[in-house]
Amino acid sequence: MIVLCGAKNRDIEGIKITVLDVGQGDGIVLSGKGKNYLIDGGSSDVKQAGAQRIEPYLLSEGIGCLDYVFVTHGDEDHISGIRELLEGQKLGVRIDTLVLPPEEYHDEKLADLARIAVENGTRVVSVKTGANIYGRGERQTEKNDSKEVMRLRCIGPLTDIPQGLTKPKAGNEASLVLEFSYGNFDMLFTGDVEGAGEELLVKSDVLRKYEILKCAHHGSKNSGTAAFLEKTDPRAAIISAGIDNRYGHPHEETLNRLKKRKVKTYNTQTDGAVTIKSDGIQISIESFLLSK
């Protein structure tokens, strides 16, 4: 099966990012400049998150094809819905390319997902740290002075480890970390990165300041350290977690670290899906539900 994606979704002025409410998991849709992306898609407490949460949203937005689906790591709460989309794309939303972390960080779950993708006509690639993906028709170069350029850049996991730092293990620590920019707007997507993986990002100086942070690992205690927040200095943060989840996410310590820095925090538990829109200058953030 050959997948050809076109800009058939509803016309978007600028970019639109929606952190879907998939319960205890992640599912993020990014649209703009003629392209549609999905960053992770799964849940550990919502059955058929792909068919019941992700695909209905995509279709409601007029998105019949995803140019890229990024998988930060192989945990079920990040890939269960993607598996459903891959297996059902002959009649549903099509996926052009599945993007995985660097090969040295692959595990059995990622290998199995890649196999399913190939069997269903989806191209599979492993992204390298430093790689850039641009909007449709934009120059595929690092030097691009247009303020309206949309770029998604892979900044982690690092494969060249500086001396004295620990290489992250496959899984959460080696999550794909993506930096998105459009004009003066930028956002950081962190998967479940924590521990050695997060420390490596901080100490290797690949991080910078971002308007919005997608909090790692559903707001767990061991992610989003004070040092990490000092580097990224977000104005707003978004946490994706399930109601009454057995892990206690988001952790009180993480919320306190964000509060201490006066970061406006959104949580899908109470806010439902969270949508960010930007024309490259102004930013709006809307939640599906009203927080209590």
Locations of regions flagged by a protein language model:
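Non-globular, low-confidence helical/coil segments that flank catalytic cores
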Residues: M1-K292
